[in-house]
Each structure stands twice: as structure tokens, then as C-alpha cells.
């Protein structure tokens, strides 16, 4: 299975967490290796002095007064200067061993406005915010991946109507989720991460029991299934009608 749906969900999750933490829209997430390691993200973007001050002030709110005062003082020293903070993927010949090593955070010419200790402290503080977000996303990516793949018990439904038997099984297939539809991505993220929903495609198979032959099959995609939901909640009637019509149109053996 390709990781298009999974990567779209992970990227949206990372961007939303950045925004919720107080990072400005000019900073967003980028995958490190979407095919090999979908859950690894790095932050990319740049902030001017005013944005740095606003961000540091916001991030310092839960800190003790002394620590917050030092960080805010460093950020204020940048006010009115051409200082600019850059975040970008680390330039490496191979993939990093640790997620924290995948991103570079850089404040060019910092010596003009800050001491080495002040600069190191400020950059470590901002990196810590990004690292915390990226690690949460990495952990949540495992839950998202599990929700998109067939479980150990993939059979969801087994119904018989006369000679016809209809089977529904979780199926290793790509969904067709629009990566630009933020509202839909948010709905899936909330359903999976908060409510424990499944988002794995479902294969509908129609079998003629008398002939012992599979007559038709179709895939239901982009459907959320919540724990305890009966089949009528997630069963796509359009796909069901299509496979039944195809099965009935098949000549008898």
C-alpha cells in the first residue's frame, strides 16, 4: 500500500500541532522520508525579530519567572534588528539516527545581538518546542498507520441471502482522501486519535454459494468505522448495489 493517505494525515497533524503551540503560519512541517518513515517530520520556515519575540513570549507562559525572563530578554534584544530565525532539514548524506538530528535551527549573525550563552539557550528552547511536537506526531503516526491497515481480525461482516453470500473484510488499499481538504483531514484525525476509529478500506465480496464462485467485488474507501458500530453505519450502499448488480449479471455456470 502507498502511504499517500497516511502522509497527508501525519502532515496535517504536525501543522495543526505547530499552530496550536503558537508557531506562526510561516512555519510548517515537512516529511523527512515519507515512504520509509512516514512519522518523521521537521519544521521549515523563517521568523523575523517581531515573530520571534511573539513566539517566545507565548511559549514562555508556563515557565517559571526567572527562566521566562531570561528568554524574553534575549528575544527583546532582537527587536528592531534584521535578525531572522531559520528552520530547515539538516543536510546529511544519510538519514539521521535520531529525529532531533533531522532539523537545523539557525540564527545568522546572532553574535551581533546576543552572547553565545543567550543564543544557545534561546535556540535550545525553540528547538525543544519543535522536538516535543515532532515526537508526539511520531508516536501518533503509529496509531494512524494501524487504523489504515487491516487488523488481525479483518472480517467485518458475513451475510447470506439465499444462494448469495456477502463478505466484508478490511482491505490493504489506498484511501482517496484529499490532502488539501483540511476539514476532512481534521475529522479523520479526531476520529482515529480521540475516538479510536478505524479508517481502513473495506473489500465487499459477493459469492454464489451454490456455484462456490466469487461473482463480484468492490472496495469501500474513505469511511470511518467507530468501535461497536453496526454494519449499517459504515456500509456504502452504492458499492453494495454495484457489486450485487455485477454479480447478478454474471452468467450462471
At which residue positions do the language-model features occur?
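Acidic interaction surfaces
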Residues: 1-253
Amino acid at each position: 500500500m502507498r502511504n499517500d493517505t497516511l502522509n497527508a494525515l501525519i502532515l496535517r497533524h504536525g501543522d495543526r500541532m505547530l499552530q496550536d503551540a503558537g508557531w506562526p503560519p510561516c512555519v510548517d512541517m515537512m516529511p523527512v522520508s515519507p515512504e520509509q518513515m512516514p512519522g518523521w517530520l521537521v519544521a521549515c520556515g523563517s521568523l523575523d525579530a517581531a515573530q520571534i519575540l511573539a513566539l517566545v513570549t507565548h511559549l514562555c507562559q508556563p515557565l517559571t519567572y526567572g527562566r521566562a525572563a531570561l528568554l524574553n530578554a534575549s528575544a527583546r534584544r532582537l527587536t528592531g534588528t534584521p535578525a531572522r530565525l531559520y528552520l530547515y532539514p539538516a543536510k546529511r548524506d544519510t538519514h539521521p539516527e535520531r529525529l532531533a538530528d533531522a532539523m537545523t535551527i539557525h540564527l545568522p549573525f546572532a553574535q551581533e545581538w546576543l552572547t553565545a550563552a543567550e543564543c544557545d539557550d534561546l535556540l535550545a528552547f525553540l528547538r525543544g518546542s519543535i522536538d516535543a511536537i515532532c515526537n508526539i506526531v511520531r508516536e501518533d503516526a503509529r496509531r494512524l498507520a494501524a487504523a489504515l491497515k487491516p487488523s488481525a481480525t479483518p472480517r467485518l461482516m458475513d451475510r447470506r441471502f439465499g444462494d448469495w453470500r456477502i463478505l466484508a473484510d478490511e482491505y490493504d488499499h489506498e484511501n482517496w482522501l484529499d490532502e488539501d481538504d483540511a476539514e476532512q483531514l481534521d475529522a479523520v484525525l479526531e476520529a482515529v486519535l480521540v475516538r479510536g476509529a478505524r479508517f481502513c478500506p473495506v473489500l465487499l465480496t459477493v459469492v454464489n454459494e451454490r456455484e462456490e464462485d466469487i461473482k463480484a467485488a468492490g472496495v469501500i474507501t474513505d469511511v470511518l468505522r467507530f468501535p461497536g458500530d453496526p454494519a449499517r453505519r459504515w456500509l456504502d450502499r452504492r458499492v453494495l448495489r454495484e457489486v450485487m448488480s455485477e454479480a447478478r449479471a454474471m452468467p450462471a455456470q
